[in-house]
Amino acid sequence: MKIFVKTLSGSNFEIEVKPADKVSDVKTAIETVKGAEYPAAKQMLIHQGKVLKDETTLEENNVVENSFIVIMLSKTKASPSGASTASAPAPSATQPQTVATPQVSAPTASVPVPTSGTATAAAPATAASVQTDVYGQAASNLVAGTTLESTVQQILDMGGGSWDRDTVVRALRAAFNNPERAVEYLYSGIPAQAEIPPVAQAPATGEQAANPLAQPQQAAAPAAATGGPNANPLNLFPQGMPAADAGAGAGNLDFLRNSQQFQALRAMVQANPQILQPMLQELGKQNPQLVRLIQEHQADFLRLINEPVEGEENVMEQLEAAMPQAVTVTPEEREAIERLEGMGFDRAMVLEVFFACNKNEELAANYLLDHMHEFEDQ
């Protein structure tokens, strides 16, 4: 099959590959076509916001006929174990796992304090180690604090692009601190819907009156309330963020427990941890204020995500409650619903999941496939 390879300079070329080819084979093929200026050892290939690992195949990475992948060259030699760890040299003592490596700090046994120096959010001891490892992997491509600063510098140091610091920061913000997707945005352009203006950090105590930065945050909340309370299931608080107790810290996300939508989303993420990041992407379109808070306090968020789901058999009822009562769909959305039905699922079930996933066809398909056995038992 034919795929297109796009460079950071804006040019592109095509190569012939097979679905069973490994990413390492594709890198070798690119070096054969482009010569010494693209050595395989320094290549980093990105597809759909994901850095492709050498040992995986194109088919495993959903690379199909006429797909395009982005190629970058790192200034240091790539690790032969996989390109995901070779996106940039790690300056000073920052942790190298900032770009989606599985060796994250999630399995630690103690509850971490969400300070600015936390690299990636660590899951606390309230969940089993196996669970924390799974969710740690799902969240390992999110960076924050001083690690975020080093990631900005790493992207600037990688070469191949002419972006300035502000552009890199904008790309990271639009990608919700996912370095891999940010790099793709730098190359292909930042989608307009992904650009979220920075909002003020939630105040640590009930001193909003003394903190002028809190006022834009409060003013932004009513704007999210378009279309009624259930128009966007991923907008957990369409009528505005609930007021935190005066004694609650800024990192306290416990108020999410009272959100029926969050309970349903938590069940979906626990069933398929890999949808955590796309779920945050969709949530960010509806409630950027909440996503900012989640980004700043990822440890608290992972603690909530790890908590057992009460009444798992009622997940679909929760999803149904999160749906709008009356909705309109575009022709494109109707086609997406029909494609999901074509996979063999009941129309009512498809509609419930499709709207619960905020009309994201990929998320809906993943959820339907992961819960196929449950639907068959009903």
UniProtKB/Swiss-Prot annotation:
Residues 1-78 form the Ubiquitin-like domain. Its main location: nucleus. Coiled coil: none annotated. It comes from Arabidopsis thaliana. GO terms for molecular function: damaged DNA binding; polyubiquitin modification-dependent protein binding; proteasome binding; ubiquitin binding. SMART domains: STI1, UBA, UBQ. Widely expressed in the whole plant. Belongs to the RAD23 family. Keywords: Cytoplasm, DNA damage, DNA repair, Nucleus, Repeat. This is Ubiquitin receptor RAD23d.
